[in-house]
Amino acid sequence: MVHSEAKMTRPDSASASKQQLLNGNADIQETNQKRSIEKNLCSQYEEKVRPCIDLIDSLRALGVEQDLALPAIAVIGDQSSGKSSVLEALSGVALPRGSGIVTRCPLVLKLKRLVKEDEWKGKVSYRDIEVEISNALDVEEQVRKAQNVLAGEGVGISQELVTLEVSSPHVPDLTLIDLPGITRVAVGNQPADIGRQIKTLIRKYIQRQETINLVVVPSNVDIATTEALSMAQEVDPEGDRTIGILTKPDLVDKGTEEQVVDVVRNLICHLKKGYMIVKCRGQQDIQDRLSLAEALQREKAFFEENPYFRGLLEEGRASVPCLAERLTTELITHISKSLPLLENQIKESYQNLSDELQKYGTDIPEDETEKTFFLIVKITTFNQNITSFVQGEELVGPNDTRLFNKIRQEFQKWSGVIENNFRKGGEAIRRQIWTFENQYRGRELPGFVNYRTFETIIKQQIQLLEEPAIDMLHRISDLVRDTFTKVSEKNFSEFFNLHRTTKSKLEDIKLEQENEAEKSIRLHFQMEKIVYCQDHVYRGTLQKVRENEMEEEKKKKTINVWGQNTSTESSMAEILEHLNAYQHEAGNRLSTHIPLIIQFFVLQTFGQQLQKSMLQLLQDRDTYDWLLKERNDTCDKRKFLKERLARLAQARRRLAKFPG
């Protein structure tokens, strides 16, 4: 029977074993499937989240934030608001604590989540110093040391950054900037204006549109009166980029819990991004050596057991883990939105800096041969620029006018001056003719024109144009001098001795050519006192004048304005015809020849003499060092611009490689 029972039970045993095997395989399969899903989610997370944060962190490490604002989360709060406790809970490391100002420099807290197998590691960086940390317990000491180096061994603050990197399986992927706590009154050895200094530093960060402001406020105070939230509202009135964090919910007075819940649910002081609430380690917990991991467990239990706050936990508005997840999501979304604008800003800044660097030229060579070649290139480029201005071929911007066009406008005004002078003199001429006919005509018969009257009137009219011509010369000479000076400034601004020498030569040549031009102009007016014109030219012009007069007479009835006899009228009409004919020819000569004189002396010859004078500088090698001596700040400025360009160039390359 025993044997038989044994035989009878074998199939059941085998069936059970088979079922256990199937169940075991199913469990393994389910576990593997969960691991696969988890691995896939982790992979997606690594592909999307980490690269975004790493990109901005790398740009910040390059120093791009010196040139442009980067997406960031800035943490602000009044002193004793629980700000340090929140950061400790997020990072898993102890940060400097104590009374008074604890955060004395902006602290960039970079948190990077590792896979479970990797070990914790940290690093503190400031200026050119990097300190690797292998034990989380050493973080507080290293941060204090960094702050003492930057802000001094006292209670002052510094705007220089301290960067703390924490890599651990137990931290979120997140980067925060911790700012000094707001204080109102200086105590002890603190500077009298410490409150103003801190607010200025905080405002520098939170006013940037690229910054999300994380405002830490204790739950047991009136949120409307907190300085931190007030500062955030000043720079972000709509609350578009402000998140409120309530701390110390365990210290809330009984009966006020519902009011705290209303604040978290955004019913009291509205912020578009809303509020979160957390419970971190207190001073007693630290003295009792409560670990951060245990503190998280106690926090969870506190919210689960509290009838008022339990709902907030279920809604994802309470606890440090919920806060970490929320901040990571906010930062990633913020970065993604900011990248296109950031890319455009970097491109624009790079172009502006490149243009500015061109003004400072290249570094001066140390080798004497190369230095000679450098100066030759500088002077040759200057001379080529001068040639382009003289020939009217210089490059100008959309709102600028070429030098020759400005000079042409002066010449056009000159033609108008001549025309107006002759036209305004018409009535005076009529009176002079009348005076001569009635007072000075001798034994001449009526109707005979006195040639001396004609000459006298012509000379007087032309003489009135001499000083306006000289004035035009001076205006154009100053215009050319100023233009050439700008060319010198563009080419030699960083070499003050070379620029000063060029300006001196410019002034000397300008005066010399101006004097020569003035002599020629005055000589021309002296020659114009000789009333002369080629016979055939004068006859042709006179004929045209008479034809025009006849046409005018046909169009209107002749009116005897002067009321004199026909002989006088005939005499006056004839002399006016001769005057008009001669004025036409003399006016043509003046409107053409005076501009030619000015062009020749104060533009072409001025430019040629300046170019020759500049080339003569190359003959004295002993002056090269003196001529190429830079302004005190030029070399530093050039180096500064090159460093900024290098940063932006690297930033552009990293943005170009970014998969997003």
Swiss-Prot record:
Residue ranges for the region (G3 motif) are 178-181
The protein's name:
Interferon-induced GTP-binding protein Mx1
Quote the gene name from the UniProt entry.
MX1
- What SMART domains does the entry give? DYNc (SM00053), GED (SM00302)
| Residue ranges of domain Dynamin-type G in the record | 67-340
**Organism whose genome encodes this protein:** Equus caballus (Horse)
Q: What induces it?
A: By type I and type III interferons.
Q: How is it modified post-translationally?
A: ISGylated.
What's the entry's take on its domains?
The C-terminal GTPase effector domain (GED) is involved in oligomerization and viral target recognition. The middle domain mediates self-assembly and oligomerization.
